[in-house]
Amino acid sequence: MPAKHVAAEDDVRAVSDQFYSALEAMANGDASSMSNIWSHEDDVTTMHPIGGREQGWDAVRGAWEGVASASTDGTVTRTDQVIRVIGNGAYELCTESASMTLAGEPVSLEGRATNVYRKEKGEWKVVHHHADYHDEFAEIVANMGA
């Protein structure tokens, strides 16, 4: 694999590390660091374990903030990471594991995730996150009115 390609994968991996740190912060009540690593364009999307789909930075940010407002004691990790770079785009496949207290209820989940990145003004940004649907997580969020 050419050195330039490996370097690009390393750059995306660094942003992924920041994203998973931000996910863990969100699982502890603080979604503010998401703003630094996500694109703020209208075409960004997310499909969380709670179901549904958000499109546009304002909707995506709102979903993260809604979950963060009811989350404490969280840990989020990933395994089985695969990253591929294609020009100014990249994707990541992995398995996510998370546990937290959500709206007073302890919840744990493990599932597949896909993240998509785009290079904007020389920096890699998250433009899409998709995690497997999780019944218990979705039910708790639905009951809290998020």
Predicted regions and their residues:
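Juxtamembrane and targeting peptides
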Residues: 1-6, 22
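A solvent-exposed, acidic/Ser-Thr-rich amphipathic alpha-helical stretch
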Residues: 9-17, 25, 31-87
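Hydrophobic/aromatic beta-strand elements that line small-molecule binding cavities or substrate pockets
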Residues: 64, 78-84, 95-98, 112-118, ...
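Short, cysteine-centered beta-strand-loop-beta hairpins and adjacent loop/turn segments enriched
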Residues: 71-73, 99-108
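A short, structured loop/turn motif at beta-sheet edges
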Residues: 83-91, 105, 117-125
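A short, polar/proline- and glycine-enriched secondary-structure boundary/capping micro-motif
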Residues: 103-105, 136-142
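Short beta-strand edge/turn micro-motifs at domain boundaries
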Residues: 110-139
